[in-house]
A protein has these predicted regions:
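Non-catalytic, usually N-terminal nucleic-acid engagement modules in DNA/RNA processing proteins
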Residues: 1-68, 73
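Catalytic cores of enzyme domains
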Residues: 66-221
């Protein structure tokens, strides 16, 4: 009912991909009252990704942060639309983490969950969502009680026997396994190893990000 109007609004605001999903059993444990999600995606600059050559760069760090901020702004447009229609909407920031003693390096809702359910792409061996733009994409999510229906079918993983990202990862954080829906993230990616390795690059800035697994991904070519 609202999907086309909402997609038009968010694309005009700067999104490159929009997805809608009914979460079912995949609801956020912290916010189970929201059974639907709007996934907002914005692709990263190919020129910036090309600056990554075996190590993270200042160009990528700055672009990463700017893209996240843009996504958060677009998410607020979605919140306004949904709440003006009489529903509730909770924005989940593009770069979000709410660590506790049990679950480090996780947020209140995985962006990839909503993106996969909406049919925007599949989870690759690098732990990232592979979309029509490859894995060089950032996401924000809006959780809501507005009834929404996925516009595309769920996609299977197409990584096959490729091990490029695993071999390129300096932290050894990528297992090289195919992601199985419902499995824990740790089966394909060790977030702690990745985070610990990035401490080497504190000179770039607080919260520096790597991007090597994106830069070598064949789906970005």
């Amino acid at each position: 009912m609202y999907e086309k109007e909402l997609e038009k609004l968010l694309m005009a605001a700067g999104a490159n991909l929009i997805g809608f999903s009914e979460l079912g059993e995949n609801r956020s444990p912290e916010h189970p009252e929201y059974g639907y999600a709007v996934t907002i995606a914005r692709k990263l600059s190919r020129a910036v990704i090309k600056t990554i050559n075996g190590a993270p760069t200042m160009e990528y760090f700055q672009h990463y942060r700017a893209t996240n901020a843009r996504l958060d702004s677009i998410a607020l447009d979605a919140v306004s639309f949904i709440e003006n229609a009489g529903y509730l909407a909770l924005p989940v920031a593009a770069s979000q983490s709410t660590p506790d003693k049990k679950e480090e390096y996780r947020g209140i809702f995985p962006h990839k969950t909503g993106a996969v359910l909406s049919g925007l792409g599949f989870v690759g061996k690098n732990g990232l969502l592979i979309t029509e733009f490859g894995s060089a994409v950032r996401f924000a999510t809006v959780l809501t009680d507005m009834p929404l229906t996925a516009q595309k079918e769920i996609q299977p993983c197409l990584c096959g026997g490729c091990q490029i990202c695993k071999n390129a990862c300096p932290a050894g954080a990528i297992t090289g396994e195919i992601y199985v829906p419902g499995a824990d993230r740790s089966t394909i990616f060790d977030a702690k190893k990745c985070s610990e390795h990035m401490k080497t690059y504190k000179n770039i800035g607080r919260g520096a990000v790597c991007g090597i697994c994106i830069s070598v991904c064949p789906f970005n070519k």
